[in-house]
Each structure stands twice: as C-alpha cells, then as structure tokens.
Amino acid sequence: LGIANNVRFQGKHYDFEVDSNQYALYANLNQKIQTDTALDVGVRLEKLDYDYSNKMISGTTRDDGSACNSTDGSCRYFRPDSRSDSFRNLNYQIGILHNLNETTNLFARFATAYRAPQINEIYRLQKEQSIDDIKSQNLSSFEFGIKRYSESSQVEISAFVMNKDNVIIKDTNNIVVNDGQTDHKGIEWLLSYKLSSRLTLTNVGSFAKHTYSYSRLYGDIDINGNAIDTAPKLISNLSLKYEGTKSLTSELEIVHLDKYFLDPQNLHIYPGHSIANLRFTKELKNIKVSGQITNLSGTLISE
C-alpha cells in the first residue's frame, strides 16, 4: 500500500507512552492610573515537559523489524527513540479600562499566547519528519471595544486583530508542518435586552475574516491569501429566555453558521446552516430536571 517510497503496512504502526508535566509562574498587576482609568498587566512563564517511551522497534521498519517494499526499505511511519522534550514559553498581556460613566466602559488589550505541540503531533510521525522541527505555535492579538450595562440591557462590542505564527497543520501528504501563518480580524458582540420581567432576548456572535498568510502549494494552488477552511465569517446565536416561575426556565435558541470552505484551496464550500434548539430546566423539591431538543426542524447539518 502507498506509493513506492512511502509504504504503508498492515500491523502495529505506533505503541508509546508519554508522561507530561506542566509548570507555570505568573503575575498580574491591576493599577488605577487615573480616577476613571485602570491598567492591567500580566505575565506568564510556562514549561511543558514530555517524557516519551517507545514500546516498539524504533525507526521506519514494520512492527516485526522487517523492511517495507520501497526503494530504500523504509516504511511510511517513523517511531522515534525514547526521549524527553520541553517547551518553554513566555507570554504577556497589557490592557486598559476606562469608565466613561457608571454604566459604560471602554477597553483595549494586547496579548500574546502559545500552543505547545500535542502528543500525537510530535510522536506519531512519518519518515520525512523530525521532532526537532516542530515548535510551539505563537499568537498575538489586539482588541478594543465598549461595554454598557443597565437594568434592562447589556451591550458588549469589540473589534480584534490576531496573527498566528508557527501554525501546526497537516499538509496534503498528512505530514505535520510547523511553518504556517494566519491572520484574523473582525468584530464580536453580545447584545441582551429584557423584553419584560420574564422574557430576555440575547444575541451573541462574531463576524470575522480568517486567512492564510503564507505560501504553500496544495496541488498547483498557492493558499496564500485564501480563506481558512472550516472557518465561517459569521457565527450567531439568538436566544429567547422565558423565566415563568422561580422553578421553571425555558429557552428557544437559533444558531446560525455561515458558509465556509472545506479545503485550503477554497474549491469546495459547505453552505452553512441555521437550526433551532429548545431547552428547559425545572426545579423540584429535591432535584433539578433539565432537558433539551436540538435541531428542532431535523435539518441535515455538518458539525
């Protein structure tokens, strides 16, 4: 099976155990710099250790040690020798909050973050791969917005810009690569209004553009500038909550997912969907009963 120099085989491909330990040091400072303005600064140092133990023959042979029917005798799957790996990352955030009045705030925040490689991304390898080539994925983001609260309403609106480097993905050959870059920008919102003492209408959503910002060929198509697959522009959740009595609550929810591409080449599209869900909670004397019906119309969707 497979191509001549990338041979799959029947049998066991991997067998390993990994012990992981995570350590973190962090500090946060919240300081008023003016009567109505506060500064929030945080820093976090994190270390993730993997102790990997291979339970099979190391290398690219079959599980019994025999060679595959390829030009050099190697097989598709690569099992590293037992080893230990560590990932250290320093992240920080700085934010500012300004009170316009008793009900309205303005805010802005810059932050960095990371995602260490997952166990399967660094130890379930193919023969072309090396653990040392896989680094942590990095993220930087900036957002600003407004929050307003009153007895009958809640409004939160923010705009954001985010960039990711060293994005970990699998290419068309199912090989983990670590050189991806993506850009994300858009708006997010939460709007809530009490229609009456028992009815509350809420809308939570985001409208954003997610794009690949690096060159990589998938077939003969360069994905640089393409929309990220499985990343819809619009996601929205509209709910109507009814609090009939102190012990009964019900909620009708409409979830909308915009269309999105199914592949990095942007050749195939999922049309999106809108579905309705119903939830209720009833508190009895000693127990709470909850239930929900999802996708009331029975619409065929992809999740």
Language model segments and positions:
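Outer-membrane beta-barrel proteins
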Residues: 11-17, 78-84, 96, 130-134, ...
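Hydrophobic, lipid-facing positions within transmembrane beta-strands of outer-membrane proteins
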Residues: 21-27, 90-94, 106, 130, ...
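Residue-level signature of outer-membrane beta-barrel architecture
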Residues: 27-32, 37, 88, 97-99, ...
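Membrane-embedded beta-strand positions of outer-membrane beta-barrel proteins
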Residues: 41-43, 94, 108, 144, ...
